[in-house]
């Protein structure tokens, strides 16, 4: 849930949005705001532990506010591999930022399995090495912290490109193979769901292809049944 409003009304709007969503579904929330103080203000209104989006090294206070907030809870957190200089163009800087954020988290008893690292994929229209850098960063991060999670804003890869959906689908498969185990994406998109399930089949993550077959029989993937 993200309010996306002006700072003056963000807390009020985000709380309203959280209430609306929690009245409709019994699912954990991913609370999203660029302002850690906003997250701090609405945190208590979540009915169950979810995910905080996000911390980074952009400013000194993000980790210092969010980590103590989720200390001793089951909350998880998304950590962006950027700092005050912006999004790194190289892999090593993303690795270095990851280490800093994981080490800070450890001081509050937050283990790597509660952290979702976002290596920040850049639009391929501006950097045609974007996927390769994302994959390399993902593999190295998983080598250092095997239990850590990897996520991404999936559609960022195709920004500025025509036929975006095929680029997004291809990115999903390659990123999953590299170690990405979650993504910010539309769960109602049939093509993306089919790609995700097919990739799980090919990676040996769907025993006897049961999830894929079940989704097809239910009409969730494949041609729409009349």
Model-assigned labels for residue ranges:
Residues 65, 72-221:
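Catalytic alpha/beta core domains of metabolic enzymes, predominantly
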Residues 12-116:
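Catalytic core of soluble alpha/beta enzymes
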Residues 1-27, 121-131:
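Glycine-rich, proline-tolerant flexible connector loops at the mouths of alpha/beta enzymes
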Residues 2-10, 28-32, 54-55, 90, ...:
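Glycine- and other small-residue-rich loops at beta-strand/loop junctions that grip anionic moieties
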Residues 8, 59-61, 146:
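Short, charged helix-to-loop "capping" segments that act as catalytic/coupling loops
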Residues 223-226:
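Long amphipathic alpha-helical segments
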């Amino acid at each position: 849930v993200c309010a996306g409003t002006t700072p003056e009304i963000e807390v009020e709007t985000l709380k309203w949005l959280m209430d609306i969503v929690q009245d409709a579904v019994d699912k954990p929330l991913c609370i999203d705001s660029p302002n850690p103080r906003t997250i701090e203000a609405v945190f208590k209104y979540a009915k169950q532990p979810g995910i905080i989006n996000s911390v980074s090294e952009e400013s000194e206070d993000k980790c210092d506010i969010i980590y103590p907030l989720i200390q001793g809870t089951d909350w998880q957190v998304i950590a962006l591999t950027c700092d005050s200089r912006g999004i790194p163009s190289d892999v090593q800087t993303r690795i270095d930022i990851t280490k800093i954020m994981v080490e800070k988290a450890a001081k509050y008893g937050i283990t790597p399995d509660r952290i979702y690292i976002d290596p920040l994929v850049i639009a391929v229209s501006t950097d045609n090495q974007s996927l390769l850098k994302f994959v390399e960063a993902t593999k190295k991060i998983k080598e250092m912290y095997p239990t850590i999670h990897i996520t991404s804003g999936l559609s960022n890869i195709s920004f500025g490109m025509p036929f975006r959906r095929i680029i997004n689908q291809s990115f999903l498969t390659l990123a999953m193979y590299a170690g990405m185990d979650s993504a910010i994406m539309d769960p109602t998109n049939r093509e993306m769901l089919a790609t995700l399930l097919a990739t799980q089949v090919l990676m040996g993550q769907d025993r006897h292809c049961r999830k894929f077959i079940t989704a097809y029989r239910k009409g969730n993937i494949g041609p729409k049944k009349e």
